[in-house]
Amino acid sequence: MTEERRSRATEAFFGRRKGKPLRNQQVDTIENLLPLLKIDLESVPPQNLVALFPADVRSIRLEIGFGGGEHLAHRAVENPETGFIGVEPFVNSMAKLLATVRERELMNIRLYDDDATQLLDWLPEGSIDHIDLLYPDPWPKKKHWKRRFVSDVNLARFHRVLKPGGKFCFASDIDTYVNWTLQHCARHGGFEWTATSADDWRTPYANWPGTRYENKAKREGRSSAYLTFIRR
C-alpha cells in the first residue's frame, strides 16, 4: 500500500501527510493559493453552498481523496456550472491539483486538506448533489477493514449531506471493498444501487478520464467496479 493511499483513511487519517520534498513552485501554491481556496470550517456554512464559489455554479459535487486531482480537474473543466469540493490530506497530491487549478484558471473548485469527516459534519443537510469516492484506501487486511472510509457512520454522513436523488459514486479494484460497500449501503437502506446488469458496474462512468490507481490495477491484472447509488 502506498503512503499516499494510507493517508486517506476513515474516521481519522493514518500515516504521513507529506512524501517527497516539494519544489519551490509547489511550495508557492500550498502557501499562497491553497489559503484562497480552502474551506474554513471555523466559519458558518452557507445554506446554499454555491456561495462558496466566485463562478456561477448551480450544483455541488464532492470528491473525497482526490489523489493527484486528475479526475477532479477533468470534471471541473467538463462541468463549469458545477462547484467542486475536493478533499485530500496528502500535501504532494494537493500541490499537484493546485498547479492544475492555477494553470487552467479553474474558478469552480474549493478544497479541504484534512479529515473529510470534519468537512462532512460542517456541511449543511441536503447541500450536496454528488459524492465521489474513487479508489479509496482498501485496507486489505481483514483486521483493518474497520478503517475503511465506507462505514455505517460515514454513510450516515453521506445521507445527511446529499440531496434526495443525489448520487454517491464508488470505484475500486478490490473485490472485498466493493462487496463491503454494497453490503453497507444495503444495510443503511438510504441508498439505492442503480445497476440492473453486470455491464452497469463493469463499465466506467461517462467521460471517465481514468486514474493512476485504475491504471495500476490494470497492469496488475485486476478489473474495477464502478458503483452508483441514489440517495433515497
Swiss-Prot record:
S-adenosyl-L-methionine binds at residues 63, 88, 115, 137. Pathway: tRNA modification; N(7)-methylguanine-tRNA biosynthesis. Its EC number is 2.1.1.33. Pfam families: Methyltransf_4 (PF02390). The keyword Methyltransferase applies. Substrate binds at residues 141, 173, 211-214. SUPFAM superfamilies: S-adenosyl-L-methionine-dependent methyltransferases. The active site is at residue 137. It catalyses: guanosine(46) in tRNA + S-adenosyl-L-methionine = N(7)-methylguanosine(46) in tRNA + S-adenosyl-L-homocysteine. GO terms for cellular component: tRNA methyltransferase complex. Coiled coil: none annotated. GO terms for molecular function: tRNA (guanine(46)-N7)-methyltransferase activity. It is an enzyme of class 2 (transferase). The keyword Hydrolase does not apply. Keywords: Methyltransferase, S-adenosyl-L-methionine, Transferase, tRNA processing. Belongs to the class I-like SAM-binding methyltransferase superfamily. TrmB family. Catalyzes the formation of N(7)-methylguanine at position 46 (m7G46) in tRNA. NCBIfam families: tRNA (guanosine(46)-N7)-methyltransferase TrmB. PANTHER family: 3-DEOXY-D-MANNO-OCTULOSONIC-ACID TRANSFERASE/TRNA GUANINE-N 7 - -METHYLTRANSFERASE, PENTACOTRIPEPTIDE-REPEAT REGION OF PRORP DOMAIN-CONTAINING PROTEIN. This is tRNA (guanine-N(7)-)-methyltransferase.
